Amino acid sequence: MRYRLVIFDWDGTLMDSVARIVDCMQAASRDAGWGELEAERVRNIIGLGLPEAIASLCPGIDSVRAELLRSRYAWHFVEGNDTPMRFFAGVEEGLAGLHDRGGQRLAVATGKSRRGLDRIFRESDSGRWFHASRTADETRSKPHPRMLEELLVELGVAPQEAVMVGDTEYDLEMARAIGMDRVAVTWGVHAPERLAASRPAFTAEAVPELFNWLQGR
């Protein structure tokens, strides 16, 4: 088995949550008095930690308004928005297959908060598939590789024994920074040509392609 550890991004890679993130960020921006944010700009920052995302979307924003925007985003995401979020078709079966074959550990590295990821784990009963996880509010945000470095130390795996799977250049670049293989998926937020610049070992254009490739490794 080539990879002892497979690390997945969450939003846009495993879960179809992009529309909800965009809606909630746009609503939060209006609530905070910053005005309307273009959907494509919001899509572009998905994967970053929330403070980093706000700083990118709202250059020059003061700390008080940034905190208001952050709190309104959290409210909209948890309580104020009912845009459906579900796993992409085939993801649950693919994760279960990797988990059940044994000998390989699974982890999550996400721009979500710990509270948000744990809530999704509970609601979807998906936490049982993963041996470890890191969120952007408990370590450095992507594209800094610290969350990957911490996962490797926790699970006792070398970078050359692991692979990162994601839909953004932030995912791929943090893996590239520490010499870790990376797999790009094209059903998320960043365009294939943008992902290709990070030189992924494989690019999956459909969920079955991703898990078939991982099963062979």
Where are these regions (language model features)?
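Glycine-rich phosphate-binding loop signature in dinucleotide/nucleotide-binding domains
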Residues: M1, D100-Q104, L155-E161, R217
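Short, acidic loop-to-helix structural element flanking the phosphoryl-transfer center
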Residues: R2, E79-V108, R114-F121, P145
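A metal-dependent, Asp-based hydrolase signature
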Residues: I46-E79, A89, A96-G97, R105
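Substrate-recognition "cap/lid" segment bordering the active-site pocket of phosphatases
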Residues: T83-R86, S113-M164, E169-I178, P192-R194
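Structural motif
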Residues: R101, I178-M180, S198
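Short acidic-hydrophobic, aromatic-tinged amphipathic segments that line or gate anion-handling sites
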Residues: F202-A206
